[in-house]
Amino acid sequence: MAASSSLSTLSHHQTLLSHPKTHLPTTPASSLLVPTTSSKVNGVLLKSTSSSRRLRVGSASAVVRAAAVEALESTDIDQLVEKSVNTIRFLAIDAVEKANSGHPGLPMGCAPMGHILYDEIMRYNPKNPYWFNRDRFVLSAGHGCMLQYALLHLAGYDSVLEEDLKTFRQWGSRIPGHPENFETPGVEVTTGPLGQGIANAVGLALAEKHLAARFNKPDAEIVDHYTYVILGDGCQMEGIAQEACSLAGHWGLGKLIAFYDDNHISIDGDTAIAFTESVDLRFEALGWHVIWVKNGNTGYDEIRAAIKEAKTVTDKPTLIKVTTTIGFGSPNKSNSYSVHGSALGSKEVEATRQNLGWPYEPFHVPEEVKKHWSRHTPEGASLEAEWNTKFAEYEKKYPEDATEFKSITTGEFPAGWEKALPTYTPETPGDATRNLSQQCLNALAKVIPGLLGGSADLASSNMTLLKMFGDFRRTHRKKETFRFGVREHGMGAICNGICLHSPGFVPYCATFFVFTDYMRGAMRISALSEAGVIYVMTHDSIGLGEDGPTHQPIEALSKFPAMPNILMLRPADGNETAGSYKVAVENRKTPSILALSRKKLPNLPGTSIEGVEKGGYTITDNSSGNKPDVILIGTGSELEIAAKAGDELRKEGKAVRVVSFVSWELFEKQSDEYKESVLPSDVTARVSIEAGSTFGWHKIVGSKGKAIGIDKFGASAPAGKIYQEYGITVEAVVEAAKSVC
């Protein structure tokens, strides 16, 4: 949080360091390199490193510049900064040591970056971690989370007190082994799986860019914040990072500033064993501005100058490559994989204390450091109060825009929004549920200000175009439709970031259902981080036909019920599609998957929005006393087959109940009484019909029932022929029903 320091003895130097908008004059940077032999820098013993790691990176067209810094004399503030940085290092060391588990290397190497961001640059209110216009910070290299916890503690967040630091990685702790937004206020997104964090950060920056273009006025700028990221070599290797960073450059997200912790160490050893590309040139090719900080260990002014330069580049994101030493200060383990993922050990901790001149007990914060950081609480409150005053004026001048803005920032949707959803009758012409989905999306876009999203280069197949809006582009940032390209994994993670930016955002993303395999990592993080992304997944079965088994998601319907906190919804017609959207929009802390058909389906008697909310419900029943002869259970496109089979069985005098099973998860949440009313336990004659794997269905049909499905890969042929050959037919259901009742 940028603000002036309370240290009255400091001169102009203090202002230069503490205020982000101060313009520092720049002079050519000196080459501050980690020595190539064992020596000391600023009194700290360092292990030898390979000088080739520190060479300038060049290309035919340009050389990636090092950050330009101003030569400043050492003052009291330098000593305070050094003590503050070492406080961060030792809080991390001590917490990992006490837990005997964790990753001390990154916090030790990245402490200077973290200090400058949280103490000098970022704007936030520690007592209100959810203040809208705060700067966002994402630790994409989530294993180094003690860096962020130490920073939150120093900054005055109530979520990380001293006693919390002592419970790191323990049962019931508020500071788990990787950052979790739902556990620790001040943590924006859940990170840990490498690459997810930088992709989430792209989503956060995209949300800021969209809101700024949509709501800022020439006389009223109410959206103005940055997204800062620290990512490591591992993140850089992940494909999801490439996907998301490609889009960030394409969209020109100028308020995204990423610090690349260039320490050249992976779990298996030096990154030279597997990672030798020029990250600098790759990011330049992606459309990023690139700066190199050659001394991330002690080059505080280099880091400050890099941030200052990054903020002058408004038309593209910035990557600041910061060359650091992992485990900086550890005389025997720094610059090695041994400091990455395990405690230093008592002897090395003591040696590090000696090496860095740290005489304090574990978890101690020196008084001068505590006093220095304490200013963030009143200054954060002041920043928020100033913004509130500005927004109050905005609300008077632009009441309609303010109402939409508040819906997005508070998560309070307009009253009666669900009434905008279309309704259908059996007389309504049938259609594919992907087409019905587009009708619902466009209806909701008119009443929910925060609804936005896009497709992975399949918008015309997924039917996800918002007809009343255009495409979000570098020059058209007000628009709500995003073109993600063929980047499924990045798309999902970007939508997580959008969702977690503000509670009223309702992001959706779309592709073929089979390609959830490409984005499952992001979908799992959606579920874990309570991000209510809507996944619009079309072409949900063999019903897509001729494209064949590579595109037919035989196993997809059965794999997601195993994932906690995610809703799978497979609607059968228009009313069920509308009901699925109602459920998905209402569940802002649970992601939803809508599995939608390519084939045209009729609007069936008995379906309803209210039924979908129960997960499973009866659509037709000619039995009495809750004692049908047989229960037919269908989902999606196979509910029509179940309904027709029920009609045939009734002609033969059978009492048949047909149940639509839209969502296992929603059905499981219902009362025992309700579940018994739909699937009475004494009726064991049950048949399920779904054009996918039968895995899991015996939990529903029981040992005496039958599950009709597909337990092998599909085939390339017209949809009707495949259904016939695989036995997903009315005749097969009738035969199965007769065999069990």
UniProtKB/Swiss-Prot annotation:
Pathway named in the protein's UniProt entry: Carbohydrate biosynthesis; Calvin cycle
Region span, Disordered: 1-33
Manner of cofactor binding, per the entry note: Binds 1 Mg(2+) ion per subunit. Can also utilize other divalent metal cations, such as Ca(2+), Mn(2+) and Co(2+). Binds 1 thiamine pyrophosphate per subunit.
Biased composition (Low complexity): 1-19
pH-dependent activity: Optimum pH is 8.0.
Catalyses which reaction(s): D-sedoheptulose 7-phosphate + D-glyceraldehyde 3-phosphate = aldehydo-D-ribose 5-phosphate + D-xylulose 5-phosphate
Keyword Oxidoreductase found: no
Top enzyme category: transferase
GO molecular function, one term: metal ion binding
Classification via SUPFAM superfamilies: Thiamin diphosphate-binding fold (THDP-binding) (SSF52518), TK C-terminal domain-like (SSF52922)
Entry binding sites for substrate: 103, 340, 434, 461, 539, 547, 598
Residue sites binding thiamine diphosphate per the record: 143, 192-194, 234, 263, 340, 488, 515
Residues holding Mg(2+): 233, 263, 265
The keyword Flavoprotein is assigned to this record: no
Bias kind Polar residues: ranges: 24-33
UniProt xrefs under PANTHER family: TRANSKETOLASE, TRANSKETOLASE, CHLOROPLASTIC
Similarity remark: Belongs to the transketolase family.
Purpose: Catalyzes the reversible transfer of a two-carbon ketol group from fructose-6-phosphate or sedoheptulose-7-phosphate to glyceraldehyde-3-phosphate to yield xylulose-5-phosphate and erythrose-4-phosphate or ribose-5-phosphate, respectively.
Name listed for the protein in its UniProt record: Transketolase, chloroplastic
Organism: Spinacia oleracea (Spinach)
